[in-house]
Amino acid sequence: MWTSYDDYIDALKAIAEPTRFRLIRLCAQGELTVSELTRIVGQSQPRVSRHLKLLQDAGVLESFREQHWVFYRVTQDMHCQKLVSELLEQLPADGDLMVLDQARLNELRGARAKLSEEFVETEVPDWLRLHEYHGDELRFSGAVKDALSPQPVGHLLDIATGTGRMLKIAGPLADSGVGIDLSKKMVMVARNALAEADLPHLTVRQEDMYQMRFPARHFDTVTIDQVLYFAADPDALIKEATRVLKPHGRLLVVAFTEAAQAKSPPPVGIVISDIRRWLEEAGLTVTATDVLPGDVLDISLLVSEKNKERA
């Protein structure tokens, strides 16, 4: 991050300007586009863009492009996060501009939430309807946390994140994280879910799960939640997940498997031996397995570790 005294002073100088401080406060609460920030602070787009560039050059903000938009958020470096957090904690929240900014941000979030809700209700993919087979959500969340808790989650990747459900469960355990989905509408839904859950250290990107733009050995933990039976090539998916996993990193696969005493034909399902085979062929070693029994479908959770020789 800041490698010298001068870099640190430059960052403080960039922050110490009224409009830029407002922008930092907003970006600390989630990912926002230039046009959204322009509407909130009530200034021209060129002026806001200039402020954002100065903050990014100083290492306080970072940005990423998605389609025609550029999103900004506070840099995820822990030193920057600590500095921004300490500054914001001392900021009186009852100032007129702070109140107005927050009201406009809340209004924007409300509009986002409405769009997300309408999309989920009218165009939701069939696989989201399978959530009814999860039974007790608290039990499922607990099983995921137990599966991941033996060691730090670190930098997290959730593949085909959908509504962002896995990010909301595992995200609080992670230092930072990314959810990816090919659908730009599902990215919108997941991004809204993270904002509502107050998880600003997580982000969502539109990506092809078979050809992710992340470098090799980039993540400490990768999750694949209820995706394999809809994947055209699950073997290739697991190999791509392994590529971006650090040596000794962990992959958590969650999948429906047919219940031992199923009361009716399962709508989907996958044979657990196939999952094990795909994991082993990708250079992973299964270290833990948990099964949550159900009436029609069991939920199987498999944790595997990347072998060092595949680094």
Q: Which residue stretches match the model-derived regions?
A:
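Core SAM-dependent methyltransferase catalytic element
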Residues: 282, 291-311
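Conserved class I S-adenosyl-L-methionine
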Residues: 252-276
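Conserved alpha-helix/loop element of class I SAM-dependent methyltransferases that forms part
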Residues: 135-154
